[in-house]
Amino acid sequence: MNALLYVLVALTWGSSFFFAKIGLDGLAPQQVATVRTVLGALTLVVVLLVTRRRWPREKRVWGHLLVVAVFLNAVPSSLMAWAEQTVPSGLASIYNATTPIMTLLALAVLVPTERLNRRQVGGIVLGIVGVLVLVGPWDVLGDPQVLASVPGQVALLGMTASYGIGLAWLRRFGVGGGYDPTTVATVQLTLAAGLMLVVAPVVATGPVQLDWRIVGAMVALGAVGTGLAYAWNTRLVGAWGAGRASTVTYLTPVVGVALGVLVLGEPLRWNEPVGGLVVLAGIALASGLLGARRRRGSGAAAAPVPAGEARAEGGR
């Protein structure tokens, strides 16, 4: 059963960029971001009610989760949707893999007790090299399509940097308050949905053209990829531990690239998978995953985050 959940999480998170790309065929970027967040929040609220979990009452928990909702949900989901107007979904899924690198950088800046060791610095440098390979600066001036995608690629780095800030906030303040991860994630997504609905009349404007493809894509992106996948991953982390569960990070770009190339017919430049592999190698080095496996037979990486969204796990 846990192996099935692992595959489901990899497929749902890996396909998030694919479904967002389809959603953009009939919705504006901020509309895609708002709909996915609202559907994800509603799905988790149903899970919370069915399982009879209680809502937090402490103001401190709600206050910190409001900050988390901004940096782990509202901002990254908006940047992701905006970026995919010009960036292929497969390449966007590869950029999502830079999240652990950004998290280490944010921890070093925002959490006084966190100090980068040589291994982590080496992993970060390797990750930066991977990003440069992904961008392909040798093609920027010679290919108008690549040049047009540069702002979107920068936005995707902003997305993962936002993850890093949010996760560093969690590490510094420990906002879980003793509540289980599903409850915390439900509050987090509900707050994010509320924020995005408030600003929707101003930023989520534009014509809406719906068909079965777009509706299905948004349900898959919101209810499944942003809602149910949270519950699945929570159970997986509980059964396997965060280190082993985090290896899904290595599969989601594979799913994203495969869907983009095979289904959407997106071009794949040689430097994109190469850069992605360099980034993943940097993550493995910085997180100590390879060394931990040699010593203990299990990973020591942080729990993964879905594409364009992230969740708070208790006092993480």
Annotate each predicted stretch with a short phrase:
Residues 1-8, 41-68, 113-122, 139-151, ...:
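Membrane-interface interhelical linkers
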Residues 12-20, 45-96, 129-133, 222-240:
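Specific transmembrane alpha-helical segments of multi-pass solute transporters/efflux pumps
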Residues 23, 32, 36, 83, ...:
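Hydrophobic/aromatic residues within transmembrane alpha-helices
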Residues 26-75, 100-107, 162-166, 185-204, ...:
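Transmembrane alpha-helices of multi-pass small-molecule transport proteins
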Residues 31, 36-38, 213-214, 250-316:
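C-terminal-most transmembrane helix of multi-pass membrane proteins
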Residues 35, 73, 91-98, 169-193, ...:
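Helix-helix packing/entry segments at the starts of transmembrane helices
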Residues 44, 66, 105-106, 119-139, ...:
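Hydrophobic transmembrane alpha-helices of multi-pass small-molecule transport proteins
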Residues 51, 55, 100-125, 254-274:
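C-terminal transmembrane-helix exit sites in multi-pass transporters
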